[in-house]
Amino acid sequence: MLLRRVTGGGRAVVAATLGGGPLSSWDWCQKLPGGGSLLRRIQVREAHREFGKNHVEVGSQAGAAGTGQPKSSLQGGGPSGPLYPPPPELQPPTNCCMSGCPNCVWVEYADALLQHYQDGGERALAALEEHVTDENLKAFLRMEIQLRIRSGG
């Protein structure tokens, strides 16, 4: 009986503080310091991928100018540099969803390598070996390049 009176009195105080309407978790969050900034709504957009382009959120630091590699860490063209450095448009993609989609950015990357190094695929395979670190992905791309060479396209 005493417990009911205490909890009933507590509800009355809260209802008087928040107003006469029903209580919800959103009402409680509005009263938190910061105005409920943790529970902001996130806008969901349809996914869209392009070869060589990462998705960058507005206001994110990932797309800010000057956040790339420092010039001192860039690889030089000297003997310690890679044998076949890819041009900027041939950098390996970083935005693969790994779902096995038919228009995979890695397959587009293999096609771009073949078009750039038009020597029958030898330099494309060498660049692939040098710039792709995942062994499973290398095997998949090797097979794709070899199939395209055999089919003549």
Swiss-Prot record:
<dbReference type="InterPro" id="IPR039251">
    <property type="entry name" value="OXLD1"/>
</dbReference>
<protein>
    <recommendedName>
        <fullName>Oxidoreductase-like domain-containing protein 1</fullName>
    </recommendedName>
</protein>
<dbReference type="Pfam" id="PF09791">
    <property type="entry name" value="Oxidored-like"/>
</dbReference>
<dbReference type="InterPro" id="IPR019180">
    <property type="entry name" value="Oxidoreductase-like_N"/>
</dbReference>
<feature type="region of interest" description="Disordered">
    <location>
        <begin position="55"/>
        <end position="87"/>
    </location>
</feature>
<feature type="domain" description="Oxidoreductase-like">
    <location>
        <begin position="84"/>
        <end position="118"/>
    </location>
</feature>
